[in-house]
């Protein structure tokens, strides 16, 4: 993969597909679209447009030119839709696919970054202020000194342990599989990661299904581009499909929310596959959005309160010890 393709991120991909969709809506051919890109696009878009103009002479379709520029699953959606004569619908689905996805760990990181930095900053400030008071007033061995040493020693160790545990959890989530993972998947933040993965998978399968893929083919398309964690679930789902015709029971690997899984099991033999997958994906996304909103409301405030209490304990104990020493 070239550097240009590697730097062509999700926003660039969406912008490209939206341009293509607009051109298609105005009745422009793919050749016209490629010419437009070659004449007035960004440097990356110009390369795509120029390659697209050369593609027919090389016996290629334009979608083949997009290999490496678009994510594999999105490209598969376009290829299948184009084969079925539904390119515009395929573009809609591809844009929808790129616009999906919920980075749980990223969201949690940004949710906690500022409060944790504030906690650390106020802790350092409190240690410094109390240290200056202790040194100036010769309060060694006092209550203030003991509180300061507690924060500097065990307190700092606890903070580092919590930070390390969170970092280790983030690292292990995409790769940890097996029975032990099934147990921790019920605990936070693993349960939120599982819900996000399930919602994104269901959305992708729904998009591929709407483009014309069977459930089995869609899973096989997604599998090579999945994390080790999701791959393990997909392998079990594909195994279930060997003997199971009900999509709900085929998807029953412990990945989905219990309520959503029950709905899929009941409706699997009745509802259209695409509708079934879309509704289940929406259920997972709603559940996660509600959970994240609750965490956003509570967690930062709790951390900030702890930071204020920590600063108050350090400075307050120093002032109290100073007052006692003056009285004596």
Task: Name each model-derived stretch.
Residues 1-2, 41-47, 150-156, 169-172, ...:
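Short charge-dense sequence patches
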Residues 6-105, 194-296:
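Glycine- and small-hydrophobic-enriched helix-loop-helix hairpins
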